[in-house]
């Protein structure tokens, strides 16, 4: 327990009006200031209320109390918001996978747009010249990657739990379906429970990773070609017995899935049964097919990834004579479509395994002559590092949550030393608005760029995850 925490369970009958929503989808309300606070010109105590939405009048139960704020859960909604929605999932409110199913999808998008704009204004001290129209797609059954936890509760409950963790806890949610997973995978959750329960290593199989590839031909009359390819990676901390192996093979045959095993680190992931198969996704606009392995990083939302790539390349305005850098390139998700447009593209990636996959994908798509790749730690970058990459008219950056601070600082140094190496335009794809805003501050106030446009992509509906895209031009 953190110092200052006061775990309580106090029902508050006095109604309060919720003002805004935070990124954890908690309603934020504020008590009227006490006489002492008012005398010191201070505002009242902040209450974070789980399950409450802006504009709603609610009563609540305080669950944790600190000197400056309290946490609570909604007790009764006296006046619901017009944008309140009925959650579709039975595990909503318990499972930590989704936090916003009770909020209309349009309101979800508006909230994420506000988060992006607020962070740009308050952290970066920059206002975008243009706000891009938010991008959205299917709101259910969109997630093609997932990591599920498994816990044996056979002693107390007579079952195994398989699912996402409960919100901000180490407990696994008791879920028999998941509305954001494709239906054929959601329907497998009860069957996976039975499978794991029957294994001799039920206590030593803590995780199942799901990776789904696109069908070979979705329009085909052949069911084998029109079905998505589904891989399940079982994290087995003990060797399987012969009986365990038989159960896994029977499960794979019955449910038409591809089973992989991971006995130790990520480097030990290998196919178990069947031994052959192919996971891939496609970018039809660019005539690109991207094979991948279950352990490779890919976007979880195939439909929105197509829209993401299309918008990024359109905004980059690549010319046939351009040299382009793609930083944090992964398996080539942006690099290979860019190679269809540019004279030459260099993809740089921190992980050796993804760099190797990117090279393989370039060869698979006949683009090895236009797309090259190198492995480099992009969190240890100096101006000399950037200079060694050579000049490029266009850059695309798609960093992980920690952002690209070292790269931005290196560009700021080059702005003062060797500005001819700076790209004319940068498209930055972000999965964390706060680190994005930090990097925007560096590029706009220290590296000589202006923020031309910014917008969100609703890559993860019903979650608080904010995916965004911004464009920088040399000032």
From Swiss-Prot:
The keyword RNA-binding does not apply. [4Fe-4S] cluster binds at residues 89, 95, 98, 178. It catalyses: uridine(1939) in 23S rRNA + S-adenosyl-L-methionine = 5-methyluridine(1939) in 23S rRNA + S-adenosyl-L-homocysteine + H(+). This is 23S rRNA (uracil(1939)-C(5))-methyltransferase RlmD. S-adenosyl-L-methionine binds at residues 299, 328, 333, 349, 377, 398. The gene is rlmD. Keywords: 4Fe-4S, Iron, Iron-sulfur, Metal-binding, Methyltransferase, rRNA processing, S-adenosyl-L-methionine, Transferase. InterPro entries: 23S_rRNA_MeTrfase_RlmD, MeTrfase_TrmA_CS, NA-bd_OB-fold, SAM-dependent_MTases_sf, U5_MeTrfase_fam. It comes from Polynucleobacter necessarius subsp. necessarius (strain STIR1). SUPFAM superfamilies: Nucleic acid-binding proteins, S-adenosyl-L-methionine-dependent methyltransferases. The active site is at residue 431. HAMAP family: 23SrRNA_methyltr_RlmD. Its EC number is 2.1.1.190. It is an enzyme of class 2 (transferase). Residues 1-76 form the TRAM domain. Belongs to the class I-like SAM-binding methyltransferase superfamily. RNA M5U methyltransferase family. RlmD subfamily. GO terms for biological process: rRNA base methylation. GO terms for molecular function: 4 iron, 4 sulfur cluster binding; iron ion binding; RNA binding; rRNA (uridine-C5-)-methyltransferase activity. The lineage of its organism: Bacteria, Pseudomonadati, Pseudomonadota, Betaproteobacteria, Burkholderiales. Catalyzes the formation of 5-methyl-uridine at position 1939 (m5U1939) in 23S rRNA.
């Amino acid at each position: 327990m953190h110092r200052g925490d006061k775990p309580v369970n106090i029902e508050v009958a006095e109604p309060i009006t919720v003002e805004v929503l935070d990124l954890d989808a908690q309603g934020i309300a504020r008590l009227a200031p006490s006489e002492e606070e008012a005398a010191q010109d201070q505002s009242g105590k902040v209450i974070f209320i789980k399950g409450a939405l802006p504009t709603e009048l609610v009563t609540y139960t305080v669950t944790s109390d600190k000197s400056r704020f309290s946490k609570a859960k909604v007790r009764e909604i006296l006046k619901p918001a017009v944008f309140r929605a009925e959650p579709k999932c039975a595990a909503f409110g318990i499972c930590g996978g989704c936090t916003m199913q009770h909020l209309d999808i349009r309101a979800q998008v508006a909230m994420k747009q506000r988060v992006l704009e607020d962070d740009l204004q308050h952290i970066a001290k920059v206002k975008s010249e243009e706000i891009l129209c938010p991008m959205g797609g299917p709101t259910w059954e969109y997630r093609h990657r997932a990591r599920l936890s498994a816990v044996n509760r056979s002693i107390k409950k007579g079952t195994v739990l398989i699912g996402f963790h409960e919100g901000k806890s180490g407990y696994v949610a008791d879920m028999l379906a998941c509305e954001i997973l494709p239906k054929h995978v959601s329907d497998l959750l009860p069957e996976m429970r039975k499978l794991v329960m029957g294994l001799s290593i039920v206590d030593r199989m803590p995780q199942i990773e799901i990776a789904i590839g696109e069908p070979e031909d979705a329009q085909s009359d052949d069911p084998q070609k029109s079905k998505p390819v589904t891989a399940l990676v079982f994290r087995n901390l003990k060797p399987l017995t012969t009986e365990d192996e038989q159960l896994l093979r029977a499960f794979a045959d019955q449910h038409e899935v591809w089973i992989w095993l991971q006995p130790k680190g990520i480097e030990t992931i290998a196919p178990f049964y069947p031994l052959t198969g192919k996971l891939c996704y496609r970018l039809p606009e660019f005539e690109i097919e991207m094979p991948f392995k279950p352990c490779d990083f890919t976007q979880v939302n195939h439909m929105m990834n197509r829209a993401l790539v299309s918008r990024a390349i359109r905004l980059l305005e690549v010319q046939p004579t351009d040299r382009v850098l793609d930083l944090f390139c992964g398996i080539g998700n942006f690099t290979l479509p860019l190679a269809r447009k540019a004279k030459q593209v260099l993809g740089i990636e921190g992980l050796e395994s993804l760099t190797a996959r990117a090279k393989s994908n370039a060869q698979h798509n006949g683009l090895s002559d236009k797309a090259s790749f190198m492995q480099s730690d992009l969190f240890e970058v100096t101006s000399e590092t950037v200079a060694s990459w050579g000049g490029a008219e266009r850059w695309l950056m798609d960093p992980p949550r920690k952002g690209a601070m070292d790269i931005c600082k290196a560009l700021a140094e080059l702005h003062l030393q060797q500005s001819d190496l700076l790209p004319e335009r940068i498209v930055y794809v972000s999965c964390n608005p706060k680190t994005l805003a930090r990097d925007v501050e560096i590029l706009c106030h220290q590296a000589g760029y202006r923020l031309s446009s910014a917008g969100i992509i609703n890559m993860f509906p019903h979650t608080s995850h904010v995916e965004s895209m911004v464009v920088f031009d040399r000032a």
